């Protein structure tokens, strides 16, 4: 496929795949770990709610993503997710892991995702010719839906075989790999310069969509 010969698109596409793998592994491992630590289905339900809630707030991130450097946004979001996810196995190792800590980290990681995915979508038309956008979007849809379905299905098996903590270590590794892939991107110069965003301008941009 010719589109995959485009170095920048390939890096972005691979990053998209690893991001989705990381998100899927994290969600299933988190649900399982919360229940294991608490033994209470209420906390599992609360964890699911807190993880899904930020996706309803994605529209609030748009004005920031539109102004920030795409490459910086892509890299920083992955680094932050990597660090936050890694806190889980580290605190577990020192016997400091609690349900409360998980319930704090989960929505933060999920909220960071709301900056990562729009930035990826915004980068796509900057890296592809107009004639390649349809193929590019199709591959991105596969990476988002197909990989998510596969990984969510396999995550339950992996949790049973490896344990949630090991899965968190693998998960943090996927975000680290993605950060390196995005760091290697060569974005057009004009996308590397962000502008400040006043409160008034933020709400104006939010209203305009």
Show where each model-derived region lies:
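Juxtamembrane intracellular "pre-TM" segments in multi-pass secondary transporters
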Residues: 1-9, 188-209
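Membrane-helix interface segments
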Residues: 7-8, 40-43, 67, 97-99, ...
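Substrate-agnostic recognition of the 12-TM MFS/MFS-like secondary transporter fold
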Residues: 10-27, 50-65, 69-84, 101-159, ...
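Extracellular/periplasmic helix-loop-helix junction of adjacent transmembrane segments
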Residues: 28-53
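MFS-fold secondary transporters
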Residues: 35, 87-92, 109, 182
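Short helix-capping/hinge motifs at transmembrane helix termini and TM-loop junctions
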Residues: 39, 62, 91-96, 163, ...
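C-terminal ends and interior cores of transmembrane alpha-helices
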Residues: 79-96
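Helix-loop junctions on the cytosolic side of multi-pass membrane transporters
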Residues: 95, 122, 126, 168-200
């Amino acid at each position: 496929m010719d589109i995959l010969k485009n170095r920048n698109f390939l890096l972005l596409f691979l990053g998209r795949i690893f991001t989705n793998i990381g998100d899927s592994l994290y969600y299933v491992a988190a649900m399982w770990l919360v229940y294991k630590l608490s033994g209470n289905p209420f906390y599992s339900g609360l964890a699911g709610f807190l993880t899904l809630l930020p996706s309803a707030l994605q529209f609030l991130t748009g004005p920031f993503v539109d102004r920030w450097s795409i490459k910086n946004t892509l890299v920083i979001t992955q680094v932050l997710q990597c660090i936050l996810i890694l806190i889980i196995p580290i605190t577990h190792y020192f016997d400091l892991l609690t349900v409360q800590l998980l319930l704090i980290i989960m929505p933060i990681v999920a909220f960071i995702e709301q900056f990562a995915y729009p930035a990826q979508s915004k980068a796509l038309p900057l890296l592809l010719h107009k004639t390649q956008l349809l193929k590019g979007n199709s591959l991105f849809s596969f990476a988002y839906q197909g990989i998510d379905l596969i990984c969510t299905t396999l995550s339950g098996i992996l949790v049973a075989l490896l344990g949630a903590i090991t899965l968190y270590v693998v998960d943090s590794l996927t975000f680290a790999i993605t950060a390196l892939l995005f760091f290697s991107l060569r974005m057009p110069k004009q996308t590397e310069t962000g502008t400040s965003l006043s409160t008034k301008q933020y709400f104006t941009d939010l209203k305009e969509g």
